[in-house]
Amino acid sequence: MNPRRKSRLKVVMAVLSGLAVAVGLTLYALSQNIDLFYTPSEIIYGKNNDPETKPEVGQRIRVGGMVVDGSVKRDDKTLKVTFDLNDIGPAIQVEYEGILPDLFREGQGIVAQGTLVEPTKLKATEVLAKHDENYMPPELGDQMKKQHQPMGISEADLKGKSERDATQISQPFGENK
């Protein structure tokens, strides 16, 4: 190979190597910002009731649902707030420290983004309130339709206090009674 061709090959290889590194770093950065969307029922049971698809403790997720009436507890000395969130099924607890949106209230639909710190507890870094009480985010509405239409929903389910949910949460993984 002549010297001119060698130098061209070196330049092409350097450009391709730089491009590969840039693509790799971009994909890594994007993977750090991907937050999967779940409903409270999907956190408890897994997507499509498959326990293998439950989010893991420590995973960053987004969860959407309704704030359970009577569940909002505020700390008098700090901006820390805890509340329960459900979607016609079991409720999960959300802990948030900061200023809540003006539209946040009990019975209101919200989306919380944060880290799952326990199987049924989310430490939120951001809380978004819906703008209209009749509005339902499309992804939340679709998930609720898919998951809850075939189920018999009781009044206790609507309030996040179903006995069936309590027994399933307390059972170790894979154990059926």
Swiss-Prot record:
The annotated regions of Polar residues compositional bias extend over: 167-177
Q: Which residues lie on this side of the membrane: Periplasmic?
A: 30-177
Task: Give the UniProt subcellular location, in the record's own words.
Answer: Cell inner membrane
Gene Ontology terms for molecular function = heme binding; metal ion binding
Concerning Pfam families, the annotation shows:
CcmE
Under the heading Gene3D superfamilies, the entry gives:
Nucleic acid-binding proteins
Topology in the lipid bilayer is annotated as:
Single-pass type II membrane protein
Q: Which domain of life does the protein's organism represent?
A: Bacteria
User: What keywords is this UniProt entry annotated with?
Assistant: Cell inner membrane, Cell membrane, Cytochrome c-type biogenesis, Heme, Iron, Membrane, Metal-binding, Signal-anchor, Transmembrane, Transmembrane helix
Write down what this protein is called: Cytochrome c-type biogenesis protein CcmE
Annotated source species? Glaesserella parasuis serovar 5 (strain SH0165) (Haemophilus parasuis)
Q: Which gene name belongs to this protein?
A: ccmE
